Amino acid sequence: MDLSPDELAGVVDLFGALTRPELKTALVELAFKQSEDPPDESLIDTAIESYHLVKSEDALTVGPTAFPVIPDGGTDLPHIMDIESRKVDRDRLGRAVEERFRTEAARAVATEDEEAINRLIDVSYDLETWGPVELANARELLAD
């Protein structure tokens, strides 16, 4: 089964937040519904790296670059898995994601990784819209 990062975010968005094992179970259930093999777990890591999903303590939630799309059969997952919708503290999550962003930005600047710098500049705008963070200074550093 091939899922885009936005579809993976759509699965998580159905619940508000999922632990990694719960997300893996949801993907197995979704694959079963579609008569396909579940996606490789690396899809989750790729979605985290691209800020489509972000870690919140021990759970994953929809990240700033995601435009969640519910994949075919996805709307049945809350009933199949019997997991209540969860709320995430957006302020605390925003601070955690900001810290991760600033660490990645510093690393990209130190290694002069132009691809990472350009990607992080784009992410900074999404992150400011998504959470209560201000990244103008970090963006200036990246642009310089």
Predicted regions and their residues:
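Leucine-rich, amphipathic alpha-helical/linker segments
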Residues: 81-109
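Short capping segments at the starts of secondary-structure elements
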Residues: 13-22, 32
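Alpha-helical context
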Residues: 2-3, 81, 96, 114, ...
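Charged low-complexity interaction tracts in eukaryotic proteins
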Residues: 2-3, 18-21, 38-92, 130-140
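Glycine-rich, aromatic-bearing surface loops/beta-hairpins
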Residues: 101-144
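Short arginine-rich
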Residues: 34-36
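Positively charged, polyanion-binding regions of nucleic-acid-associated proteins
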Residues: 1-17, 42-46, 97-108
